[in-house]
Each structure stands twice: as C-alpha cells, then as structure tokens.
Amino acid sequence: MGHRKLASPRRGSAGLRPRKRSSELLPTPRTWPQINSPNPKLLGFVGYKVGMSHVFMIDDWPNSPTNGKEIYMPVTVLEVPPIIPLALRAYAVDGKGEPNVITEYWSPSSLQFLDITRRIRSFSSFLKNDESKKKFEEKFGSKLDLIKSNLDRIVYFRLLVATQPRKIPSLGKKVPDLVEIQIGGGEKKAQLDYALNVLGKEISIKDVFKEGQLIDVVGVTKGKGFAGVIKRYSVVELPRWHKHRKGSRKIGTRGPSLGTPSYTPQPGQLGFHRRTEYNKRIIKIGDDPKEINPAGGFVRYGIVRNTYILLEGSILGSKKRPIFLREAVRPSYVFENAPKITYVNLLSKQG
C-alpha cells in the first residue's frame, strides 16, 4: 500500500526516539562550535527559566516585510547569576581515536566556594584546617604539571563550573549545579592561561555572550507523565461506531505476531525529554531587574534579583529549571547590533 504513504504518512518523528525520561536535569551539549576568535572564551553559560513576557521592538531582520518597523515579540526571561569555574579538565585522543579526559586540575581557590561541599561531600575534609588545605594543593598540584607536559597531545580544554542558586531565593535550593563548558578560540597555550586565570573567579554572562547574537538552548522539556498514543504520537483517532467497539483512542494493529516493530506507536513516557533548540536570539542582557519585573512578580517564580536575559520566542522547560546556553553551532544569520526595544510589558501576569 505504497499509495497510503502520501495520504496517511507515519506518525511521530524517528529522530526523537527513544522517548524516555532524561537521565539528568541539566544536560551537557554533545557538540561544540568552532569559533574564529584570537582570544579564548567560554562557549556556554547556565541560566534559570523565569517565565515569558512580551516587548515591542524595531524589526532588524534583513529582507523582512516589517524591516525597520515596530513589531510585537514574545520573549522568555532567564535569570543568569555569575558562574564560578572550579576545575580544569584536559582531553586528549586515546588509542581508539576518541578524546577522553587525561586529568583534571582543581584550583585551591575553588575551596573558597563553600557550597561545593553540598555537591561533592568529600571536599569537606579539605576545609578542616590549614594542613588539610595543603594536602589539597599537593594532590592536585601534580595534575597541572601533567597538563603542561602534555600540551601538544591535548585536543581541547573544558572548565567544570558551578552555578550559584543561593543568589536566587525563588529557586529554594542551595546545592549548585555542576556542568562542563568547553573553551574556544585562541591557541592551546592561551586557553590554558585563560583557564588558570578564571579558576575560582566569577564569570558574568556578558563575558560569554552579547546582545543580538544567536545561541542554542539545551535542556529538559516539561514532563507529562504516562500518555496514550493519541497524545504521544498524534495518531488519528478511530471512528466511534459499532465496528470499533474495542476502543477509538488506540492504533488499529501493532503488526504481525513475530514481535512489535519499534516504529509502531505505543503508550509510554511523554515529556521530560532532553532536547536542543537552535538559533534563539538574545534580545537584551540587563542588570536592573526593575526593567523586567512585572507587578506582583512572575507567576510560580517571583521576582528577578540578578542579571537577566531576554530570548526571542519560547524555549523548552518549566519554570525554575536550569537551562544550558551554548554558542550557536549553525547560526542562520550574524547580527552586528542588538535590536532596539521600545516597550517592555510590566503589567501583572496574575490575571
């Protein structure tokens, strides 16, 4: 029945399988872009989703019918307090031709970030006295020498950074989120010097991204629980007449009796999937929360108290969920400047 492929194509995307729950709440990107920059920089950042609002802005997309005119634009608000790099990981190619971690170097200044003991309990033993801190330096001091001696073998560097949820009272948590962020731009020696310089120091989102550029968003979607085939795959509901008395919100058949094909729609987990959305434009990066906080705060979140960004359109995930922001791997356009915003909605979102 090849003719049925035109009138009734298969339901559900095979590119999104398996439709299972994500193994981690803050996923790390599986690929990183190659940037042409003489100076090293981080290729990503972490923020927390606040909610949505809308602005009026001057359309600056080239060849757009509304270019130069004021347009309405829905935006997503993310709160992005500074992140703190704690460790440096060096990757080199192994015998199988795949890059793997050869060692990692923890800076002594990382012990000043006391919340790390909430995530890594074993580090609490290094905070007892000065003697224990010296043991920490002796343990990881040789790691840095190993990195410098194998600099020609290293493929790339990544920084293990921690977020600061303590600065966001709306989240109601103190345990930091740890994630790896790759360093791009410059030569290997310059990347190593950059990493050693920023270890233990706060990095702002303005050091990574700028207004107007396109970025990718990596995160976990909203969880919907167990769902049937109608909602999960959008298959056509069967007619509700006497010959379909066994049910309508189901598929007609699962196939031959030799085993159900993997492509046959079946009920199961819906939502809480790891997904990547490409080319989300940064409309604005602001330091004054009064410019974005609506009357009464954001529903189910509260008010923004730190640096924030506005992303064009909607993004995945629920409110208060950590979202990974990455340099665009395939930007559709490179903007020179940020768009001009003429109005930001500050009316109450509580109805």
Swiss-Prot record:
Belongs to the universal ribosomal protein uL3 family. Part of the 50S ribosomal subunit. Forms a cluster with proteins L14 and L24e. One of its GO terms (molecular function) is structural constituent of ribosome. GO terms for cellular component: cytosolic large ribosomal subunit. The gene is rpl3. This is Large ribosomal subunit protein uL3. Pfam families: Ribosomal_L3. Residues 1-31, 246-271 are annotated as: Disordered. SUPFAM superfamilies: Translation proteins. Keywords: Ribonucleoprotein, Ribosomal protein, RNA-binding, rRNA-binding. Signal peptide: none annotated. Disulfide bonds: none annotated. It comes from Saccharolobus islandicus (strain M.16.27). One of the primary rRNA binding proteins, it binds directly near the 3'-end of the 23S rRNA, where it nucleates assembly of the 50S subunit.
